[in-house]
Structure formats: C-alpha cells, structure tokens
Amino acid sequence: MGEPTIEDYYVEDRTFPPSEQFTAAALLSDTSHHEEAAADYEAFWARQARELLTWDEDFHTTLDWDLPFAQWFVGGKLNMSANCLDRHVEAGLGDRIAYFWEGEPGDTREITYADLLDEVCRFANVLTGLGLERGDRVAIYMPMIPELPVAMLACTRIGVAHSVVFEIGRAHV
C-alpha cells in the first residue's frame, strides 16, 4: 500500500463531540438547531445567513457543491465590514465594546463599535485617496496594535484583499 493521496482525505467519517464543560457553557440548551440542520442543512444555513447577516444582494443558491469544491451563498453580495460594524451601530449598540485590546502590562483599551466604525471609515477613505480600489491587494505589516483590525476592516470595507504579515521575532542587534 502506497502513500495516501489527497483524494483519500475527501471523506471524513470521524466525529469530534464537544466536552461536557464546553456543552454546559454553550448558548444553546437544546438540540433543535442541530435537528433542523440535520433535516435540511441548506435551508437551515440559508435561514441563518439571511437572519444574521445583512446582504447587499441576496443569494440565489445556498450551496453549489461539486467535490472537492463548494460555493456557499452563490450570487449573494455583502460587505463584511458593514456586517461587523454598521449593523451593530444602526441597532443602537454603538456604545458597546467591539473588542478589548491588551498590550504590555497596564496598556489596555476598550474600543466601541461606534469608535471602531469611525476609525475604519476614516482609514478606508485614506486608502481610497491613495488610489486603492475594489480588487486591489495589499499586505498589512503591523504589530498587534489596536490599529491592526482597523486596517483589516478598512480594506474589507472597500473590497481590497489583504494579507496580514506579522513579525514573528528578530534578533536584537
């Protein structure tokens, strides 16, 4: 028997049940979501996507599955930056904490949805002013500072693909 090929890994039969501790802390206390998804997973995920996300254009096909390729929510268009920020501010949650940032000991910040949206829009305008537009690609080389998610969400907001490059470490000279 030779080495396995990629095709040998197309089917996964193992299951990985959550721990009791994880299950106890879950937001769902019954199995109704699981049962609904098991009965008709495409309808389940279509409903979840329409209820939980804001779509600029609705999708016409929930799943186009042609092994080993899958396309979810075919024909749909959304802006993930708007889904991460705008919808929460518009729902009156702008003063809620979007994320907590912790740097060096004692260096912390709480960033609200409204503040984050403001920063993201301002940086998206900077990127647009530099000539970046939908379909362009950028690499973001920044440390883990509060401005990193601002840069990422600003790129997402204007349709610029981005890759984050972290400095793993360097020798002290």
What are these language model-derived features?
Residues E35, S81-A82, D95, Y99-L153, ...:
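Conserved AMP-binding/adenylate-forming core of the ANL superfamily
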Residues A25-H33, D66-K77, W101-I111:
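Acyl-group handling in specialized metabolite and lipid biosynthesis
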Residues D8-S32:
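Short, contiguous pre-domain boundary segments
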Residues E35-F59, G76-A98:
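A short N-terminal helical cap/helix-turn-helix that marks the beginning
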Residues T15-T23, R50-L78:
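Short, charged, surface-exposed hinge/linker loops at domain edges
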Residues G159:
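Structured binding elements
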